[in-house]
């Protein structure tokens, strides 16, 4: 096959929903990693949480993101990708805005009505609701809106978009932190995903389904999840592998506070996290 033929295959092999979904993924990852790279500093430096409380809250933030993704696919299939993706970006925009507004005066009545740790914990769980819908929608669109001869390339493009957004996020967070203030990092994350709401609303069209496989209910997804965990060997493997990820994610939960407290309080922590 000539280079020209392959180019034509690639040009014609992806439908418009593929490109809309994957471009939106850049900005969703930018928002997520931008917010996550500044979250520990924000909780510890601006909201005066202890190191232990900061670790617990950032761990809750990251843990809920990955846990709720188990059920996000079933919800996305029921709603349809366009509706689910639009809803996800609206939820994320509101969630990131609320995180950056935790210390604002207009939230003072709510802060005073409950322990601050409980309030912040509830707010930090909100982004997980949006991210749990984004992942299955973008991956599902990549599968449905690409022809079979370029589908493998489609997944490569998807992961490239993830990496671009994941690299840009901490860089943007560093700039916002230094020039606008730490709270504004979360406002920029909110604006990024809010813009993607309009991109999806105006340009995304529901990709065609492959086959007539019935949509699973949330209860069926939960049963399947438990069935997967049942084999003891696989469960032991997951427990062991979990230890690796616990250590890995310390770069977002513990490392920022360590650098700020023990190394250099003026260190540009967000830029350090780009190495991830």
Tell what function each PLM region has.
Residues 90-115:
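C-terminal ends and interior cores of transmembrane alpha-helices
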Residues 59-74:
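Central cavity-lining transmembrane alpha-helices of secondary-active solute carriers
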Residues 2-15, 211-239, 265, 271:
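Juxtamembrane intracellular "pre-TM" segments in multi-pass secondary transporters
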Residues 78-92:
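Cytoplasmic membrane-interface "Motif A"-like loop-to-helix N-cap segments
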Residues 65, 152-178, 190-196:
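Glycine-rich segments within core transmembrane alpha-helices of 12-TM secondary carriers
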Residues 121, 183-202:
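Symmetry-related core transmembrane helices of the 12-TM Major Facilitator Superfamily/SLC fold
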Residues 37-53, 253-276:
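Short amphipathic helix-loop junctions that connect adjacent transmembrane helices
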Residues 133-147:
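Intracellular juxtamembrane helix-capping segments at the cytosolic ends
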């Amino acid at each position: 096959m000539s280079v020209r033929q392959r180019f034509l295959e690639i040009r014609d092999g992806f439908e418009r929903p593929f490109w809309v979904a994957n471009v939106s993924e850049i900005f969703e990852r930018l928002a997520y990693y931008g917010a996550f790279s500044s979250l520990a500093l924000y909780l510890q430096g601006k909201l005066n949480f202890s190191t232990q409380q900061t670790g617990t809250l950032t761990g809750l933030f990251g843990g809920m993101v990955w846990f709720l993704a188990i059920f996000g696919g079933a919800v996305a299939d029921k709603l349809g990708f366009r509706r689910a993706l639009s809803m996800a970006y609206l939820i994320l925009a509101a969630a990131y805005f609320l995180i950056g507004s935790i210390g604002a005066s207009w939230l003072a009545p709510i802060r005073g009505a409950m322990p601050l740790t409980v309030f912040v914990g509830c707010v930090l769980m909100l982004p997980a609701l949006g991210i749990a819908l984004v992942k299955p929608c973008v991956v599902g669109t990549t599968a449905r809106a690409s022809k079979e001869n370029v589908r493998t390339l489609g997944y490569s493009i998807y992961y490239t978009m993830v990496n671009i957004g994941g690299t840009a996020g901490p860089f943007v967070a560093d700039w916002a932190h230094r020039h606008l203030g730490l709270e504004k990092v979360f406002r920029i994350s909110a604006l990024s995903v809010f813009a993607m709401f309009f991109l999806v609303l105006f340009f995304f069209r529901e990709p065609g389904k492959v086959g007539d496989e019935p949509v699973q209910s949330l209860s069926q997804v939960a049963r399947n999840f438990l069935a997967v965990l049942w084999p003891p060997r696989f469960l032991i493997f997951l427990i062991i592998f979990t230890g690796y990820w616990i250590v890995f994610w310390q770069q977002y939960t513990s490392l920022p506070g360590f650098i700020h407290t023990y190394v250099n309080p003026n260190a540009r922590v967000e830029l350090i996290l780009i190495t991830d």
